[in-house]
From Swiss-Prot:
Motif ('KMSKS' region): 618-622
UniProt cross-references to PANTHER family, sorted A to Z: LEUCINE--TRNA LIGASE, MITOCHONDRIAL (PTHR43740:SF2), LEUCYL-TRNA SYNTHETASE (PTHR43740)
Name by which UniProt lists this protein: Leucine--tRNA ligase
UniProt-listed PROSITE patterns: AA_TRNA_LIGASE_I (PS00178)
UniProt gene name: leuS
Keyword Ribosomal protein: no
Length: 858
């Protein structure tokens, strides 16, 4: 073992050993407990960023910890390789998405290896290869045959200038990002998978996910959005078909003063035919894409259609308005509006002078006031005829029963969740395996003709998808008849919804090998960002249930435990140019002066300009405050970067990047190295003889075993990796000061260092590998996690604090099993205590075993 710690040399050597010996390549072993650890796979954007490093370090720490617990650990990696950024980069760099993607994969793969992550590289795949998406295509055709896939028209963002569909992120302030043309909403046929068929199960099974953060489960519950309500009909004057509305508040029915319909509702289209003003308003609403989250805050606009509806119970005639806050995608595209008891309806009614009819008053008898805002609480009905005096649930049931009896409504369960639209009008995605014959019939591509391969040698013009532009690509046959291929591609969430399962049998000649899949699944630990709570994590749960119902897997859920790591933040600096726009300056190009509390007082860039400090914010390209992991690894070594990542903050909280913290982690590793070197260079040590230890030696050994117990619990159960590292650091401080003279001193240090090296191994595997060999052991990758000795934790002696009238006056060292009488006698005879009791009468003595003797005297 060299005296100086040289991370670059060590890491290169150890990584080569892992590659050569295929340390992390695994197969099914029925005799061993399995552990499947997975971090969300990366999009091959070109370079790893610190967010990746944090995510993958956490996954690797869990994997290596479980490995030393003796489990059969699988930790795979791959590439989420389809998607829009590749198309944009291809246009910008005058290339095709495929070569750009494959080059990035090679570069990033090398970066992952330099960080020392223990992946089974034999399981690696990229989702953009036909070997992967072929099975997705086949599974989709099976779902179609089961009636779980259908096609319907749905709105998309349309650029009339480029004549192309835009993704949401390509719409900037309502305009096309390329040509600045106002974007329109256009209806086109698209493919959907019936996730709504599984809505109730997806909701119910959240209760079984005990290893998931409560916040993620709440987000999914809200996204699925189960509600119990009433679906009821309003007859429309002059129309045959009634207006169907859904409400969760039938108790407010008698307060309805208008009906609101979405701009896309058939009635709105009909009413606007002979009303140019209404037609223009409908068009404006349709081309204003509204996110559901914005509904509460946006300006409420509407227009009277001239149509009237008839209240189903009291016969009141109410106007029908087109309203911009009613969305066609949710419910029936029509709402019954009760301004007195719904704030959105209230704002709209106030603006357009529509009646506000209160019908609910507070249960506590306080005065009802709707002069400034709606009263939205549940309460007691009044001015509601036969329903007066009823509370919410009674009114709900009674009104629903009456509507049902009259054939005008029924109780129903509604979900906010919509079917999954999987069509994308983009090129760089898996082709949807459907064809249309000349008679207009749609058919799935037969299994023996799969995969439908996406051509990779294409020219991107930045506007039209190459497979849409090349008419010959779509031309094919079906049962000998001419047919046209679907030129839309799958939503890239399709690939990431089942990749975790493909890792179990990446070479299988089917979507999965059930035997292998059921050995490994479900994933024991999944690590990724909380931003995926509602899309990726929900789609994966759905896909898992589809795979189960198709007979491939036996489990109900894909991921047992979920850890959502926090974001990585860094200081951000900017300079305002003459135009008043912010130029973001990289933190590495800024010199800062700090005050006594470490706050930045002044910042100057490398051109000598004073720059503004914007605070600690998420690392991003747009703010130019990303720190390149490569530079940090080159400077300090992978182990240091990994250790800092795990120590600087709890895994699920934001992490503030501070290079001073990285330097601190590096100094700590040097200290450990130095102590191991000093100890090992003296030759082999004896084993600990517990019966021959002095009091101080026993105390140190107790600290060692307490640390093992704490670190084991912190990493294994609590996943508070930062406190585990803090405990190891604390122990190292004690070991550095401990005597190393006697045989038993060296024996204890040897036991301690062997424990420390194994406890550090998950975080810092390269240095641990070297130190383990220096300590006379063979291979730390196949070592056993240290176990704490229960006997070592037992204390022979206790320190008892003596308090006199609430103030600390003495400390006693007593036998661990000392009785109250013995402690009392020692306490009252302690020289210091006697001083403070002189001349006082003892009134009360309180004894807390093993801790405290409290004396009250006056």
């Amino acid at each position: 073992m060299q005296e100086q710690y040289n991370p670059q040399e060590i890491e290169q050597k150890v990584q080569q050993h892992w590659d050569d010996s295929e340390t992390f390549v695994v197969s099914e072993d029925p005799n061993k407990e399995k552990f499947y650890c997975l971090s969300m796979f990366p999009y091959p954007s070109g370079r790893l960023h610190m967010g990746h490093v944090r995510n993958y370090t956490i996954g690797d720490v869990v994997s290596r910890f479980q490995r030393l617990q003796g489990k059969n650990v699988m930790q795979p990696i791959g590439w989420d390789a389809f998607g829009l950024p590749a198309e944009n980069a291809a246009v910008k760099n005058n290339t095709a998405p495929a070569p750009w993607t494959y080059e990035n994969i090679e570069y990033m793969k090398n970066q992952l290896k330099l960080l020392g992550f223990g992946y089974d590289w034999k399981r690696e795949f990229a989702t953009c290869t036909p070997e992967y998406y072929r099975w997705e295509q086949e599974f989709f055709t099976k779902l179609y045959e089961q009636g779980l896939v259908y096609k319907k028209t749905s709105s998309v963002n349309w650029c009339p200038n480029d004549q192309t569909v835009l993704a949401n992120e390509q719409v900037e302030d309502g305009c096309c990002w390329r040509c600045d043309t106002p974007v329109e909403q256009k209806k086109i046929p698209q493919w959907f998978i019936k996730i709504t068929e599984y809505a109730q199960e997806l909701l119910d099974d959240l209760d079984n996910l005990e290893g998931w953060p409560e916040m993620v489960k709440t987000m999914q519950r809200n996204w699925i959005g189960r509600s119990e309500g009433v679906e009821l009909s309003f007859a429309v004057n002059g129309e045959e078909a009634p207006l169907e509305v859904y409400t969760t508040r039938p108790d407010t029915l008698m307060g309805v003063s208008y009906v609101g319909i979405a701009a896309g509702h058939p009635l709105a289209e009909k009413a606007s035919k002979n009303n140019p003003e209404l037609a223009a308003f409908v068009e404006e609403c349709r081309n204003t894409k509204v996110a559901e989250a914005e509904l509460a805050t946006m300006e409420k606009k509407g227009m009277d259609t001239g149509l009237t509806a008839i209240h189903p119970l009291n016969g009141r005639v109410v106007p029908v308005y087109v309203a911009n806050f009613v969305l066609m995608d949710y419910g029936t595209g029509a709402v019954m509006a009760v301004p007195a008891h719904d704030q959105r309806d209230y704002e709209f009614a106030t603006k357009y002078g529509i009646d506000i009819i209160p019908v609910i008053k507070p249960e506590d008898g306080s005065e009802l006031d709707v002069s400034e805002a709606a009263y939205t609480e549940k309460g007691v009905l009044f001015d509601s005829g036969e329903f007066d005096g009823l509370a919410f649930q009674e009114a709900f049931d009674a009104i629903a029963a009456k509507l049902e009896a009259e054939g005008k409504g029924k109780k129903t369960v509604n979900f906010r969740l919509r079917d999954w639209g999987v069509s994308r009008q983009r090129y760089w995605g898996a082709p949807i395996p459907m064809v249309t014959t000349e008679d207009g019939e749609v058919h799935p591509v037969p299994a023996d003709q799969l995969p439908v391969i996406l051509p990779e040698d294409v020219v991107m013009d930045g506007v039209t998808s190459p497979i849409k532009a090349d008419k010959s690509w779509a031309e094919t046959t079906f049962n000998g008849e001419p047919a046209l291929r679907e030129t839309d591609t799958f939503d890239t969430f399709m690939e990431s919804s089942w990749y975790y399962a493909r890792y179990c049998s990446p070479q299988a000649d089917d979507i999965l090998d059930p035997e292998k899949a059921n050995y490994w699944l479900p994933v024991d630990q999944y690590v990724g960002g909380i931003e995926h709570a509602c899309m990726h994590l929900l789609y994966s749960r759905f896909f898992h249930k589809l795979l189960r119902d198709a007979g491939y897997v036996t489990s109900d859920e894909p991921f047992k435990q979920l850890l959502c790591q926090g974001m990585v933040l860094a200081d951000a600096f900017y300079h305002e140019n003459e135009k008043g726009t912010k130029e973001w300056i990289a933190p590495t190009d800024v010199t800062v002066e700090r005050d006594g509390k470490g706050r930045i007082e002044k910042a100057v860039d490398d051109q000598g300009r004073e720059v503004e400090h914007s605070g600690m914010i998420k690392m991003s390209k747009s703010k130019n405050n990303g720190i390149d992991p490569q530079e940090m690894v080159d400077k300090y070594g992978a182990d240091t970067v990994r250790l800092f990542m795990m120590f600087a903050s709890p895994a699920d909280m934001t992490l503030e990047w501070q290079e001073s913290g990285v330097e601190g982690a590096n100094r700590f590793l040097k200290r450990v190295w130095k102590l191991v070197h000093a100890h090992s260079s003296k030759g082999a040590a004896e084993t600990v003889d517990a019966s021959a230890l002095s009091g101080n030696q026993k105390a140190l050994r107790r600290d060692i075993h307490k640390t093992i117990a704490k670190v084991t619990d912190d990493i294994g159960r609590r996943q508070t990796f930062n406190t585990a590292i803090a405990a190891i650091m604390e122990l190292m401080n004690k070991l550095a000061k401990a005597p190393q003279e006697s045989v038993q001193d060296r024996a204890i240090l040897d036991e301690a260092l062997k424990a420390v090296v194994r406890m550090l191994y998950p975080m810092t595997p390269h240095i641990s590998y070297e130190m383990w060999i220096a300590l006379g052991e063979s291979n730390v990758d196949s070592a056993t996690w240290p176990t704490f000795d229960e006997k070592a934790l037992v204390e022979d002696e206790k320190t008892i604090v003596v308090m006199i009238n609430g103030k600390l006056r003495a400390k006693l060292t007593v036998a661990a099993d000392a009785t109250e009488e013995q402690v009392r006698e020692l306490g009252l005879n302690d020289e210091n205590a006697k001083k403070f009791l002189d001349g006082l009468t003892i009134r009360k003595v309180i004894f807390v075993p093993g801790k405290l003797l409290n004396i009250v005297a006056n």
